[in-house]
UniProtKB/Swiss-Prot annotation:
2 X 24 AA repeats of L-D-L-S-V-S-P-L-A-E-L-[SP]-A-K-K-K-[YS]-[AD]-R-D-[SP]-P-P-K-P: annotated span: 89-138
Family: Belongs to the helicase family. RecQ subfamily.
UniProt short sequence motif Nuclear localization signal, positions renumbered to this chain: 1416-1432
Region (3' overhang DNA-binding) location: 967-969, 1069-1072, 1167-1169, 1178-1182
Residue ranges of domain Helicase ATP-binding in the record: 746-921
Designated gene of the protein: Blm
Protein name: RecQ-like DNA helicase Blm
EC number: 5.6.2.4
């Protein structure tokens, strides 16, 4: 990944580095760049003496000789400058240390460009004093020197990063005086007097003046109190005021200082040269000029203190000095800036104000008018902004410094960026114009050449086919220049005018193609039946023209290859088509090819058109270019035509030729370009298939659902970051391609857009922000709800060598402080920082860190994982998530990504509203988890646990899963039951301590525990991809909750089971929990009850597809036919749909409602079960006691199944026709049935009330049996030994990863992706290159764990090769044994009677022998592989089972061996009992 070019840092003044910049709150950490391309923080190259105090400074400053040279302060007002003392241990580290010469581009070639202090008079004087005083004076009294900036400092070339940044000392006041002198002038006697005087605490700074070549000298004086704000008087300059202030203060106490100041003032007046200001080319800071990126002097982008608002410009005093060269009091100040206005601008604005578009009422106009008006306003706005910016560009940025809140650096960056875009736009436009001109020139050349060729061919054709007696006059051909001027007609338009518009016709791409010359237009009108004023050159029945048409048809059909190239290809692939650029419409080859001369064929086309009497030709769908591209054979002599034609003059159908052309078309299909639409029908299925495939990936959402993932805006690799993106994907993550919508999301967020990403579990949401994080400078803040998820993600990224950290309360203080220090560095090393929402809402320290990062532009983006927790309409609302909306308000320019796997349309909108995401891009993927098999089974008390235990024990030992329970008590009871039945299980719920929960979760993740019995809170973000089953022992609380919980199975893409055990009483238990929660508001409680009714309806529905019900809840269309495409994963309703039939149950529901009305009126209360018994006609004691058996409602549904009656009443409750009121009796809820609020709709209206009832027993049994047989049928695998090798290899790889994960105290997924392990077991790599070519395997994780994994795969690869060799050898032997038996068919001496008599015994023994051989062969294969791996050889079945159990997965191997033996014996008995004829091989799939 290429590094960004590092912009050159601005050289700051020494005073700005040490804090003497007029800002009392200046801290070292505030000197940060505001652009991301800024290099790491630099420090002051001068070591400061932090031990010196203010008293020592004052003391030493009062001493003689060795004073300190004051540092120049880069404040806005020089009169408030302060003095700072700096001492050095040695002169070699002081700023006056001799360094190599440094040249400046602004220096003239005539004057010296180096700053060599060793030969200057000032350096000699200072060196003498240093030599004389250094052995006597302490270190604090060493002279120190200041320079106007690091660019002038002798230590500027030293490594800045090696120095230390010292905190600023207490500031002292100084006054700044500028001195000027010519470059040739030496130090005068007055100056030497000044140097030799007691006032030695000043410094001369030499730097060239760009205007007049003079050198300015800076004199800094100490111990001056801050002068009062002087009254602005034009007659006095700033320098005079300052000098007067110093004299007033120092003259009573120190006359020598006054004299020296007077001499300095005289020297200033005599030697100061005028210094004119040159507009915007001057820098904002005179002491640090530097070229910006745009070529203008200004703020260096990314410089320290860039956006601080000064009270006065830093160069205010310098500007006054440069403007006033003499102290003349009455000299007026000339304006420093000039702005040039366009004289026509006023008229332009007046015209715009009077434009008619301002009077348009948007509410009364149609769509086309509004689009036109919108285009006008957009274009005019761009034009206005260009004129506005041209004026603003003429005003220097320093002019706005006095405006409160103005950020000069941001202003200059905006200006530079606008200029870059403007220049880039102009560059692209110039390139486009150049290419268009070249293309136009090429087209004109081709037009000229092709017209000449057409003219020559037409003349030759007419001459060769004409006779002296009957010669038709040749129509004059227009000249090339004349044709260009007349604009040759478009051929497609001509075909349209001649024969009508074809079905697949597309309009011309340019107006130029629609223009026809008058002569040709008139001719076409005549041909198509309009008023005729044109006389054709020949008669209608001219035999010569008929012969010409027949010749043309013959030539077209005589060349099948050329005809095929035009009529059966998807799109034209001729080279001349590609030269004409991209085309549109179906006739791609003829859209732009409007330059040929058609006049030579118009008469023939007219005759043919009249002969056909309006009947359309099969060639009308093609362009003229396609017809003329066929070679026309030149015939010097007339030859007879040997092709039989039909009535229309076309060749009769020849089946042989058609098959030949069809085969050639298939061979040429790979060369066809797919750049444009095709006229061939063969492309339609291809495009429809791709569209369906894309639709399947993106999901078929409802019409009103917005999805930016399918618009194409963010598709492809056409962006500047695309190259780095693909490199990072391959290098850092070991992937070669993206999953659906991943590329679009990454492109959108790298372009700075806010994104809402909805992907199913296992869809790759993490990559959508992890890959952009490593491509962007700065920190990506990831907000995740669970610490366990954060822990897993950090370990996984650490294995990929990606720097990811987290902040939580459980970390050590040293680790936390190290992370905070890194976040304050520039730039931070951390790429992803994981935090919980509580950390953001409650930690003031972290909030301050975010502010610091944002001020330095080092926050790449915010990522909000599990964003459905934001919405109170969701199933897992968390209050701290709702507070995350402040992030967008506080950091509006930072992109945000919200990710979730479950969100209904209502929840999606609420998420965006809560997070304050306004212009957000939506990326929705299909909710369908095609590898999950959904089933709903009845829950029958305690026996259900036996069914669960039996189901788990029927699965392989390495299959793991989750059992969801409603309460803690259920979790404990279920886990105990599983352990009792031999299933390794553990419970997980909120009643355990954090240590216990973490330990149990780790045991389940690493495979020590096979099943975890947990409440619904478990599993969010759990990164365990090989979960093979998720069982719900109790009812979920909502459909979206069930979708997310069940979605934790099968994240590796393999088939997994999702089984829900349903009992209506679970719904009553959940309602009881909701009623007992007094903190719930009414509207929130109603939401939960509605969600509960939906999941009950999902379970009660026995006919509709389970997937369709789930996806419809999320706003996506799905059908039962799509579910049945893969019967292995089809839901139970789709498989068992034949066991039920849909009936119109409206009258039955009304009967049930009348029963409830009569039986439950007054104070009578009865449950749903009691009403069902009455409707069914039961005569239990309670019904007889209440005399309900005598009511007319008794037995009205006696023909129905009892379960169907229960389901009917439950459906009426869910639909609101009935209601259940919970009444608690001794803490046991009883649900009594009453009429619901919607009962009037049922009784008075005609609602659609379809209901599925069970068919009779025989029909149901036949239907279920037929489906079951089709679902359970499987084909025997002849390569069972090979499959066993791959399975054992996969088991060993899993065990190794679990062991490593357990040692490192991380999850197995953090070691290696589960898909990578499966690929390893399938491909069995033997080299590092082969291993690294597997997806998800990178150089980083291979260096850590690849060697051990490669050792396992290499061993199994050797075993596979040996087994393959044994298989090949035994197959050859079996084939050799079977060859002699084939000769018996021709033996006429066979005694067939004896054969029939002995058929039974002979056949039995033969079959037994054959089966024994086949079984022995397979056992021998397995034995060979085992003996190779385990260095042993066994012959007995018992010994072979023991050998299989020695390695890893031995228990599974023993079971496989046992099942193999049983299948072999079954095969043997089946053949023995059914073979009464020849000894034949069994059919594939039989046993």
């Amino acid at each position: 990944m290429s590094k960004k070019p590092v912009a050159q840092r601005k050289q700051l003044t020494l005073s700005s580095f040490i804090g003497l910049d007029g800002n009392s709150q200046s801290q070292p950490k505030s000197r940060a760049a505001s652009v991301r391309s800024k290099p790491p923080a630099v420090y002051n190259p001068i070591f400061l003496d932090a031990s010196s105090s203010d008293d020592e400074t004052t003391e030493i400053s009062s001493q003689s000789n060795n004073g300190t040279i004051a540092t120049k302060k880069s404040s806005r007002d020089p009169r408030t400058a302060k003095l700072k003392k700096h001492t050095y241990l040695d002169l070699s580290v002081s700023p006056l240390a001799k360094l190599s010469a440094k040249k400046y581009a602004r220096d003239s070639p005539k004057k010296p460009t180096s700053l060599d202090l060793s030969v200057s008079p000032l350096a000699e004087l200072l060196a003498k004093k240093s030599d004389r005083d250094s052995p006597k004076k302490p270190v604090q009294n060493e002279n120190s020197y200041t320079y106007r900036g690091l660019s002038e400092s002798p230590v500027e070339n030293k490594s800045i990063g090696d120095t230390l940044r010292k905190p600023p000392q207490k500031e002292r006041k100084t006054s700044i005086v500028w001195l000027s002198d010519s470059p040739e002038k030496k130090v005068t006697q007055n100056e030497r007097k000044i140097l030799d005087s007691p006032l030695q605490r000043f410094s001369f700074e030499d730097f060239p003046n760009k205007e007049n070549g003079n050198r300015h000298h800076l004199l800094t004086l100490p111990d001056s109190p801050p002068p009062p704000q002087p009254v602005k008087k034009p007659e006095k300059t700033m320098w005079q005021n300052e000098t007067k202030t110093i004299q007033d203060k120092d003259s009573p106490a120190n006359p020598l200082v006054s004299n020296n100041l007077a001499s300095i003032s005289t020297l200033l007046d005599s030697s100061r040269a005028p210094n004119t200001y040159k507009g915007s080319s001057r820098n904002l800071f005179e002491d640090s000029p530097e070229k910006s990126g745009s070529g203008e002097q200004g703020y260096k982008l990314g410089s320290a203190k860039e956006n601080e608002i000064p009270t006065k410009p830093a160069t205010a005093s310098l500007e006054r000095n440069s403007v006033t060269s003499s102290p003349s009091p009455a000299a007026p100040l000339k304006p420093r800036y000039s702005v040039a206005f366009d004289n026509s601008l006023a008229d332009y604005l007046k015209d715009l104000a009077q434009n008619d578009n301002f009077s348009i009422d948007p509410n009364k106009q149609n769509t086309e008018t509004l689009k036109s008006t919108l285009g006008f306003f957009r274009n005019t706005y761009v034009e206005l902004m260009e004129k506005y910016c041209s004026l603003i560009d003429q005003i220097p940025a320093m002019h706005f410094n006095e405006i409160a809140g103005f950020q000069p650096n941001t202003f200059l960056k905006l200006k530079v960026m606008r200029q870059k875009f403007k220049a880039r736009t102009q560059l692209v436009q110039n390139s486009l114009d150049k290419k268009e001109s070249q293309l136009k020139a090429e087209q004109e050349a081709l037009e000229k050449e092709e017209i000449e060729m057409q003219a020559e061919q037409a003349q030759q054709t007419v001459l060769s086919s004409s006779s002296p007696e009957k010669s038709r006059p040749i129509m004059p051909l227009p000249k090339v220049q004349e044709i260009k001027d007349e604009k040759i007609p478009n051929r497609n338009q001509l075909i349209h005018d001649l024969c009508g518009e074809p079905d697949n016709f597309s309009p011309p791409s340019s107006p130029r193609d629609t223009q026809l010359i008058p002569k040709r237009q008139q001719l076409i009108n005549d041909l198509c039946g309009e008023p005729d004023d044109f006389s054709p050159p020949s008669k209608q029945n001219d035999p010569h023209l008929l012969r010409k048409c027949e010749e043309l048809v013959h030539d077209l059909c005589e060349e099948p290859d050329d005809y095929l190239a035009q009529s059966m290809m998807l799109d034209g692939d001729l080279e001349e088509e590609q030269l004409n650029g991209p085309t549109q419409g179906t006739t791609t080859s003829g859209m732009d090819d409007d330059e040929d001369d058609l006049e030579g064929l118009l008469a023939e086309i007219e005759d043919e058109h009249q002969k056909m009497q309006g009947r359309r030709s099969e060639f009308n769908g093609y362009s003229y270019k396609e017809l003329e591209a066929v070679k026309v054979k030149e015939k010097h002599k007339e030859t007879p035509i040997n092709i039989s034609l039909d009535d229309d003059g076309f060749p009769e159908y020849d089946e042989a030729m058609f098959e030949q052309m069809h085969s050639q078309a298939a061979a040429n299909k790979s060369r066809v370009s797919s750049a444009g639409p095709s006229t061939s029908k063969s492309v339609v299925p291809t495009k429809q298939t791709s569209a369906l495939h894309s639709q399947k990936l993106s999901g078929n959402f409802h019409a009103n659902v917005h999805n930016d993932g399918i618009t194409g805006e963010f598709d492809g690799q056409k962006f500047e970051h695309s190259t780095r993106l693909m490199h990072g994907l391959s290098y850092s993550f070991g992937l070669k391609s993206f999953r659906p919508n991943q590329l679009q999301v990454i492109n959108a967020t790298l372009l700075g857009n806010d994104c809402f990403v909805l992907m199913p579990t296992g869809g790759g949401k993490s990559l959508c922000y992890q890959l952009p994080a490593i491509l962007t400078e700065g920190v990506t803040i990831v907000i995740s709800p669970l610490k366990s998820l954060i822990f897993d993600q950090i370990n996984k990224l650490a294995s990929l060598d990606i720097c990811a950290k987290s902040l939580s309360g459980e970390q050590k203080m040293a680790d936390v402080m190290a992370i905070y220090r890194d976040l304050e560095s520039q730039p931070p090393m951390v790429k992803l920082l994981y935090v919980t929402p509580e950390k953001i809402s409650s930690s003031a320290r972290f909030q301050d860190t975010l502010d610091t990062l944002n001020s330095n532009n080092y926050i790449s983006r915010f990522v909000i994982d599990e964003a459905h927790c934001v919405s109170q309409w969701g199933h897992d609302f968390r209050p701290d998530y709702k507070k995350l909306g402040v992030l967008k308000k506080r950091f509006p320019n930072v992109p945000t990504i919200a990710l979730t796997a479950t969100a209904t349309p209502r929840v999606r909108l609420d998420i965006l509203a809560q997070l304050n995401l306004k212009n957000c891009k939506w990326f929705l993927s299909s909710f369908n988890r095609s590898n999950l098999r959904y089933r709903v089974l009845p829950k029958k008390g305690v026996s259900t646990l036996d069914d669960i235990s039996r189901y788990i024990r029927s699965k392989p030992q390495h299959f793991s899963g989750i059992i969801y329970c409603l309460s803690r008590k259920e979790c404990d009871e279920t886990s105990k039951k599983m352990c009792k039945d031999g299933v390794r299980a553990v419970s997980y719920h909120a009643g355990l301590t954090d240590t216990d929960r973490e330990s149990r979760q780790k045991d389940w993740l690493t495979g020590k525990m096979r099943v975890i019995c947990a409440t619904v809170a478990f599993g969010m973000g759990i990164d365990k991809p090989d979960v093979r089953f998720v069982l719900h022992y109790s009812l979920p609380k909502s459909i979206e909750g069930y979708y997310q919980e069940a979605g934790r199975a099968g994240r590796d893409g393999d088939v997994a089971d999702c089984i829900l055990y349903y009992n209506y009483s679970d719904m009553l238990r959940i309602k009881k929990m909701l009623d007992s929660d007094k903190a719930l508001q009414y509207n929130v409680k109603k939401i939960h009850v509605d969600n509960l009714y939906r999941i009950v309806g999902y379970c009660e529905n026995l006919t509709d597809c389970r997937r369709a019900q789930q996806l419809d809840y999320f706003g996506e269309h799905f059908t039962s036919e799509q579910c049945l495409e893969n019967r292995e994963t089809a839901c139970d309703n789709c498989i068992n749909k034949r066991a039920y039939k849909a009936v119109d149950a409206l009258e039955h529901a009304r009967k049930a409602a009348r029963a409830v009305k009569d039986l439950c009126s007054g104070r009578s209360r009865f449950t749903l079960l009691h009403i069902a018994d009455v409707l069914k006609g039961s005569k239990i004691k309670k019904i007889i006691d209440f005399n309900h058996h005598k009511t007319p409602h008794h037995g009205v549904l006696k023909d129905w199944d009892k379960n169907d009656v229960h389901r009917l009443l439950r459906k009426m409750v869910i639909d609101g026709f009935l209601r259940e009121d919970l009444i608690f009796t001794n803490d046991f809820p009883q649900a009594y049935l009453y009429l619901g609020n919607n009962i009037s709709k049922l009784m008075e209206g005609t609602p659609n009330f379809e209901f599925a009832v069970t068919k009779n027993a025989k029909e149901a049994k036949a239907a279920v049996g037929s489906v079951s047989d089709g679902a359970t049928s499987s084909t025997a695998d002849g390569q069972s030994g090979m499959r066993e090798i791959h399975e054992r290899c996969y088991t060993d790889l899993l065990d190794l990863c679990r062991t490593i994960a357990s040692q490192r105290n991380v999850t197995m997924a953090s070691i290696m992706n589960i898909q990578a392990l499966k690929s390893m077991a399938e491909t069995l790599p033997i080299t590092e290159k082969d291993m690294c070519s597997i997806p998800h395997v990178t150089k980083a994780n291979f260096d850590k764990y690849g060697a051990k994994l490669l050792e396992i795969t290499s061993n199994y690869a050797s075993e596979k090769l040996l087994m393959q060799a044994v298989l090949d050898e035994e197959e050859e032997q079996a084939a050799a044994k079977q060859r002699p038996s084939t000769s018996g068919w021709n033996n006429e001496s066979v005694d067939w009677d004896m054969a029939v008599a002995s058929q039974g015994n002979a056949n039995t023994s033969g079959a037994s022998g054959f089966n024994s051989f086949r079984a022995g062969k397979r056992k021998k294969i397995y034995k060979s592989g085992a003996s190779k791996r385990y260095k042993t050889s066994t012959t007995s079945p018992a010994a072979r089972k023991t050998t299989s159990a020695r390695g890893r997965g031995g228990r599974a191997g023993a079971k496989r061996a046992e099942s193999s033996a049983s299948s072999a014996s079954g095969w043997k008995s089946k053949k023995t009992g059914n073979s009464f004829g020849f000894d034949l091989m069994p059919l594939p799939g039989s046993k």
